[in-house]
Amino acid sequence: MSERSVSKRTEQKRWYTVQAPEQFDREVLGKTPAEEPDKVLGRTIETTLGELTNDASENNTKLTFKINEVASDSAYTEFIRHELTRDYLRSLVRRGSSKVEAYITVLTTDDYRVQIQPVAVTTKKADASQEKAIRRTMIDLVRETAEDHTFEQLIDSVVEGRLSSAIYGEAKDIYPLRRVEIKKTTLEARPEEVAAEEETAVDVDEEDVDVEA
């Protein structure tokens, strides 16, 4: 392809300003080019919490958003993932300490399915029963939080550190803790996707029922 053809195609593309969701104050995430608005939909963009808040101490928190709406020259996004950097997570663990993790899938009050991965780091080596008790506390608190939070409220609780602080407050009585963090949060399914899965499950169950003549 000639340089002129490439240049012409580039000129035909339109630039869209990508914005964070309203809960992140519609902060500008960047710009993305496309020939048609539909080609912008589904694109993802990663940033850090520090870039959104102008606080360098938050640069260890990565946020990923997905474009789900385009209007005029603006591309709007939804939150799909929160994750702490590997370097930061490694810095939490000291020799002779224990790292306790859990993987919890929850449903918010507005029917978003989310997986949350908390991690607790102890000051010294904990035994198996103590690790189990800490993990149980993490699971219970994450589930309780999801049961009375909308998706937006739950993400705010994670990103702002309230959920990890609540876990720390409960679990530190089991064994001294150095730190509790939410390692990763992932949007697994939206309400319409959850409803479709439930409908499919019901259809399958009905097909499995034996009807006696």
UniProtKB/Swiss-Prot annotation:
One of its GO terms (molecular function) is structural constituent of ribosome. InterPro entries: Ribosomal_eS1, Ribosomal_eS1_arc, Ribosomal_eS1_CS. Residues 189-213 are annotated as: Disordered. GO terms for cellular component: ribonucleoprotein complex; ribosome. Belongs to the eukaryotic ribosomal protein eS1 family. GO terms for biological process: translation. It comes from the Archaea. NCBIfam families: PRK04057.1. This is Small ribosomal subunit protein eS1. Residues 194-213 have a biased composition (Acidic residues). The keyword Metal-binding does not apply. HAMAP family: Ribosomal_eS1 (MF_00359). Keywords: Ribonucleoprotein, Ribosomal protein.
